[in-house]
Amino acid sequence: MVSIAFYGGIPGGISTPITQQSEKSKYEENTMFQPYCYNNDSKNSMAESKEARDQEMNLKEESKEEKRRNDWWKIGMFLLCLAGTTGGILWWYEGLPQQHYIGLVAIGGRLNGSGQSNAIECWGSFPGCRPFQNYFSYETNRSMHMDNNTATLLEAYHREITFIYKSSCTDSDHCQEYQCKKVNLNSSDSSNSVRVEDVTNTAEYWGFKWLECNQTENFKTILVPENEMVNINDTDTWIPKGCNETWARVKRCPIDILYGIHPIRLCVQPPFFLVQEKGIADTSRIGNCGPTIFLGVLEDNKGVVRGDYTACNVSRLNINRKDYTGIYQVPIFYTCTFTNITSCNNEPIISVIMYETNQVQYLLCNNNNSNNYNCVVQSFGVIGQAHLELPRPNKRIRNQSFNQYNCSINNKTELETWKLVKTSGITPLPISSEANTGLIRHKRDFGISAIVAAIVAATAIAASATMSYVALTEVNKIMEVQNHTFEVENSTLNGMDLIERQIKILYAMILQTHADVQLLKERQQVEETFNLIGCIERTHVFCHTGHPWNMSWGHLNESTQWDDWVSKMEDLNQEILTTLHGARNNLAQSMITFNTPDSIAQFGKDLWSHIGNWIPGLGASIIKYIVMFLLIYLLLTSSPKILRALWKVTSGAGSSGSRYLKKKFHHKHASREDTWDQAQHNIHLAGVTGGSGDKYYKQKYSRNDWNGESEEYNRRPKSWVKSIEAFGESYISEKTKGEISQPGAAINEHKNGSGGNNPHQGSLDLEIRSEGGNIYDCCIKAQEGTLAIPCCGFPLWLFWGLVIIVGRIAGYGLRGLAVIIRICTRGLNLIFEIIRKMLDYIGRALNPGTSHVSMPQYV
């Protein structure tokens, strides 16, 4: 049975019946009801429109967030696939046979503490030399031998080290192809005229067979020994020796030298060794069993001579050639006498470096008897593994400078240890890895570490940037320390020289003083003996001289040398003190520079040092690289979220405070009005139902509107409450609520601030309704006590955001640790389960349920 209990309404509205049903509902006393002045569509819109919009916005934000998460997951998977692909390619490449590989080797340098046996060390003054700094070392206890069956250290050096010095000028035209034809050189015995004839079968002249080659644009024809060239496929095309090697290219050549009669450009000159023969007293005689350094087209046999008339003499020959145009370049012929030359491989041809005051010439020599050699100057070639650039018609070398090679001989007998020191840079060059001795390629764990190489790529980029700065800082620091150290050494040497001079003067003064004392003693003895002044004049004259004491000290003449000594001692003393003071200052500055770390460089070194020390198995451990990959992957996938959260916290701190206070104010306001409204409504219902308020609460969710249908409203009470909280501005004041039972009263009076208990409530309500609020006004209201939490605490919000971000990072770490522990636990459980099953299987096998073995019966 349905009975109508109350008709209520508002002025201008539709009277809405409030009905009661006998159906029971849950008792909720804090729920507020408003008169039904709308139809079902209006009620649905009023109760659900805001919630629907909020849900739609939340869904959109979740969709965007999910999409971003998916995007970063895709990026992470892409990096993982890229690492796997790169690792696979490197793994495949590792399996291929490699004759050469690119290694990091420094160019140039000198030997330090080498114990070099009978070797000439040519360092420092070479053009293009760069110093070494402890890059690699080689040790052996084998001595030098002339036996072909013994591998010496210099031969190992030849096989391994010298091949790394391969550089070329970018503008060099040395290694081009030449069109050459074989010719004979015939001379008459009575004259120095030599004819050039085109023949098929060539004969030797001056110890060599000859080629006539046309250079670029057929503008120049060169007459060269056949030993300098290499034929290509039995054709008329020839190339110089050494051009089939692998070359590293440099951008410019540092110096020009005179090559024969031609000014050439030397790109990079590496160090080389030449050996002095054993048991030879004359240190100017150099043997020819050094390593192959490819100075020009030098063969395995080589030597160095000083260019003078006693060693080599120029043979002036006239070369006659018919029918040629342009430039015809002929070699220079020498006759040389070399003593104590022993061929390393019993070959007749040797290479000789002949250096003079302003030039260096490279000779090819052929032994025609025991000591006499016929030599020719090389026309072109490779000097010290560097291309030579010959002048062309439209290209000239300007500002020529010539280099002198200063060599010193080390007469030690054992070749035990050498080390390359003082390096300023590392250059990637091809290095052979097939030889049995010498510099050997040490493989790093590259099978599985092919994947490792891809994994650590990102870390290598950051490490390279950090370490590059560290290296530059350290290099600058070392250079400064070296400069100060050199100043200290120079000052110390100068001070020692001055002290030595002072000591010499002081010693002379002491001797002279001793002589004077001896004279005084003698005079005293004469006075004591004779007590006569005249007798003293018969003795040695007591004179104050300044000359050093010697055997004839009694015959010195009086002079002012002593005063000069004193003056010099004072001057030297001042110079010594000044020099030593400067040395002390330089030494102190050197120590300060060396011990003062650069903050950024020190941070970089400490950072990567801690990373390297923390990761287990530093070296070849695969665990290190796996952990590093996980850290990099975590950083790549988490850093965008962290940065985005930080941006949200910093950019939205101001508006967040306004929204928070707005929400708190409306919540408090709504709570007061809800309590008062509910009390008024209870009083009204008590008058209608005869005091049976409980009966109303049991049926309050069963109210129907004028047509008896309120199912839509009854099913969504929580949505109605949320809608009321969201639309705080639609709330009506206490006075308006009271007007429900008094139709015709004005509703907007309270909204204008004329009613209410709080005089600031109306203005604050309008201020909060403005979008975003006003931080300054919020602070004013907070000081007046009308706000619970001030919105001007931006540092607090920022700090809280940072705490959240740090917590998020810690959360990632803890979750990762939890995953690792879970995986380890599963692995241990699997191992224990396998062990259990094995033991159970073995136990069942040894103790079957039914025995098939009959035990023997004893009767």
UniProtKB/Swiss-Prot annotation:
User: Which residues of the precursor form the propeptide?
Assistant: 1-6
The keyword Glycoprotein is annotated on this UniProt entry? yes
Q: Which domain of life is it from?
A: Viruses
Provide the residue span(s) of the region labelled Fusion peptide. Answer: 446-466
Chain positions carrying an annotated carbohydrate: 40, 112, 141, 148, 186, 214, 233, 244, 313, 340, 368, 399, 406, 411, 483, 490, 550, 557
A single Gene Ontology molecular function, please? structural molecule activity
Which keywords has UniProt assigned to this entry? Cleavage on pair of basic residues, Coiled coil, Disulfide bond, Glycoprotein, Host cell membrane, Host membrane, Host-virus interaction, Membrane, Transmembrane, Transmembrane helix, Viral attachment to host cell, Viral envelope protein, Virion, Virus entry into host cell
An example of a Gene Ontology BP annotation on this entry?
virion attachment to host cell
* Transmembrane regions listed in the UniProt entry: 615-635
Q: Which GO terms describe its cellular component?
A: host cell plasma membrane; membrane; viral envelope; virion membrane
Record-linked Pfam families: EIAV_GP90 (PF00971), GP41 (PF00517)
Q: Which residues lie on this side of the membrane: Cytoplasmic?
A: 636-859
| Keyword Coiled coil included in the entry's annotation | yes
Q: What does this protein do, in the record's words?
A: The surface protein (SU) attaches the virus to the host cell by binding to its receptor. This interaction triggers the refolding of the transmembrane protein (TM) and is thought to activate its fusogenic potential by unmasking its fusion peptide. Fusion occurs at the host cell plasma membrane.
Self-association and partners: The mature envelope protein (Env) consists of a trimer of SU-TM heterodimers attached by noncovalent interactions or by a labile interchain disulfide bond.
User: What name does the UniProt record give this protein?
Assistant: Envelope glycoprotein
Q: Gene encoding it?
A: env
